[in-house]
Amino acid sequence: MTAVEDTTGTRTAADAVEAAREHLLLLQSPEGWWKGELQTNVTMDAEDLLLREFLGIRDEDDTREAARWIRSQQAADGTWANFHDGPPELSTTVEAYVALRLAGDAPDADHMARAAAYIRGQGGVPATRVFTRFWLAMFGRWSWDELPVVPPELMFLPRWFPLNVYDFACWARQTIVPLTVVGAVRPVRPLPFELDELYPDYDVPRPTRTTGWDAAFQALDKALHIYQRRPAKAVRRAALRRAADWIIARQERDGSWGGIQPPWVYSLLALHLLGYGLDHPIIQRGLDGLERFTIRDEKGRRLEACQSPVWDTVLAMNALTDAGLPAGHPALERAAGWVIREEVKGPGDWSVRRPELPPGGWAFEFDNDCYPDVDDTAEVVIALNRVQHPLAEPAIERGVRWMAGMVSKDGGFGAFDADNTRTLCRRLPFCDFGEVIDPPSADVTAHVVEAMAHREMADSLLVKRAVGWLLKAQEPDGSWFGRWGANHVYGTGSVVPALIAAGVRPEKPVIRDAVAWLERHQRDDGGWGEDLRSYRDRSWAGHGASTASQTAWALLALLAAGERGESVERGVRWLVERQRPDGTWDEDHFTGTGFPGDFYINYHLYRLVFPLSALGRYLKGS
């Protein structure tokens, strides 16, 4: 018996694994995939209502149900946050407020008055992000002249020129290109009400930026505003046509753009403004696709910002094999078959920097052939390497080849592109909505290392360089930054197992420092948690309410490092004692990251797959 079995009486780690495994198997679709809800914030729902209002396709039932969901997420002080139990967020609150006004909520209603008071106290509409002011400009409640300009002529910049569209991360370029169209057309379709209550009765001081690149970009923006008033007509027409062609070429089979909300919504707006009617097949596919991202339940109507079936499926496969499911189990064979069919076999934007690299990656979503990513591909390779399927081996080989070709110059790996590191993009006045480049990250690089190690490539130059990158990326306190998960717990939980798999000995200082950091940040209740505020405030690193997924990440690192002491036993006990009767765990806190500091995700399957992996490896003694 383990210590956990001795001290928990009727509930053991083995019991928890069995219950979680059975629950996960029940969630598999007949086709073989898994997909949990991808929960974000109410800007998705607010902007959906704004889109439909602008296009003239408002549905009263949908509006009422979306408003009900938005109200259900409002905090007692009248604000909305970007993640559960997070601080108020101004732009999110403004967009939610405007959406509720569209739904008929009176400005003098108590919940609206509280929201408006907060908004005014934070500087009002003038202090919001560019996206929010874009929406308000389209509805006549903000001046287009007061927005930064990114003209569609951007499409003419050659690929070697700074700030060409491929200098931006894939999610940013997909959003910026359609917004260049919207900003050039400058539509105004006034709302049926004013928003005076969202403006303070004083001038909001603007930050003074007069030196270096900031001053240069301010001057550039002034020049672009002058050009915007009198653009060269032939050049502008050609630029808009090129932008439209670029957008149309990237629409996916399901009607989406990149399988994510921002470029999807703005692409629909851009094409509509260029004359594509609501009955045009491209627009119709886009609108129909949004319906498939809609969830309706007792709380109302809400929109997923994205869907994660490939990611969820391979994490589920890895969890089930960690939990002892045989490699030839029908559920795993069915999942492997579905994953293999999802391989992206054509070129995408990644080909711009890697034109000679044959395709062979996987995307995050059901349909996203333009943008496979290294992180999903690494987890696919790990998952397929563990199961029995007649078509797995050639798919794995293509995935390994594609991953290897996506390495950046410094030996690390970004998510969607190689060497997407031009930090100048971050300085554009337009780019205040989150991360806009895709440099190598510790978690993605670690997953590649782990995948390659599973393929007996630990001694390859590629893996050695990646390991070297990870060693340099370790924080002075022993942790690693988490780009795609919250935050240092995720980064450390990803890197330590990868380094061990690559042959780094557990007694090495890099591993001992990581173990010490995790042990120092274990909470009194035995779990681990890290609040998303750690992305803006380093004092939160490793601190926050214990969650099932973050406790599992810490355990995965400690177990890989060979730890078997009290810290591990307390973490396992935390998971065993807090498991629900149905085999899963509660997790209201968001532990996924879209843009550090700006956009976060609650992956509803994380609370099941990662604890199952951790407990399964614990029982195996590894």
Predicted regions and their residues:
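Preference for long, amphipathic alpha-helical scaffolds in soluble/luminal domains
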Residues: 1-622
